Amino acid sequence: MRLGIMLGYSGEGFAAAVDELVEHERSGVEIVAVPEAYSFDAVSQLGFVAARTTRMELTSGIVQLYSRTPTLTAMTAAGLDYVSGGRFSLGLGASGPQVVEGFHGVPYDAPLARTREIVEICRQVWRREPVVHSGRHYRVPLPPGAGTGLGKPLKLINHPVRPRIPVILAAVGPRSVAMTAEIAEGWWTLFFHPERAASVWAGPLADGTRLRDPALGPLDVLATVPFAVTDDPGSLLDAHRAMLALYIGGMGARERNFSNELVRRYGYEREAALIQDHFLSGRRAEAMAAVPDDLVRSTALVGPAAYVKDRLAAYAAAGVTTLLVSPLAPTREARLAAVRQLRDLV
């Protein structure tokens, strides 16, 4: 199982965080993910990280597909792969309607079909083929009558470092997970629960794998967790509980909350409904209190060293191949030491 770092949303401490990341690379960390959401864009930060690192893989965690044209997404991935010397993987996802429509001002429609078309177009660009695509959602070049009529198939001017840049798709629902297992090199999970994951995702993963091109290789399964080795996990788990309450209760509308839907499929139907009711009514403390202890503990990597080692084994046994951690230690030195300790436990 590979060990990686999940950077936080950029702010005043970005340069210091990258300085720290360089030290993590020296200690054996193999991959770093840079988020985007509706913060600073991930691409500019990834370029900075590429210039400061030499070995670790870089991935976007995630860029969403509605705010960029498919060919721009492909160009950007090829550019990041170029400046990093072939170390970039494209983390791509649909985000959700509140961000897509509320921040970018474009309709949130057909996320699965759009994702499939975008991946097809990206791979054409990376193979340096003249881009010709006639899909339901994207047409390249535009056909006669849809523009000036002067568009023609073009191929990327530059020769990409690699003709196949790995694609990591963020997926939660059964159909999106099945599609990911079919067409992508990697799967970005959400709130991965090692003991309950198979009951939710084993079927969709099997359905997609049956259609998978063997040339893609085995599916890389990425899970993100807050992490700390500590004999007193209470306050750190409370912080994770607050984050779960936010996502389950308020990260999306009542009728369209992917985190809430996932937790229901994990078997916490009553709790998910209660968390959402409390959160959307402004009762944040009650929403936190309603988050099941098992969900908090199982989606974090927080506790004594022996416990953390056991949980690492549980993640690996459940199929996770890349673990991206957010170290919770309060100082740079403590975070570096914690990640070195985790490296020894993996």
Cite the ranges covered by each PLM segment.
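Active-site-adjacent structural elements that line small-molecule/cofactor binding pockets in enzymes
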Residues: M1-V346
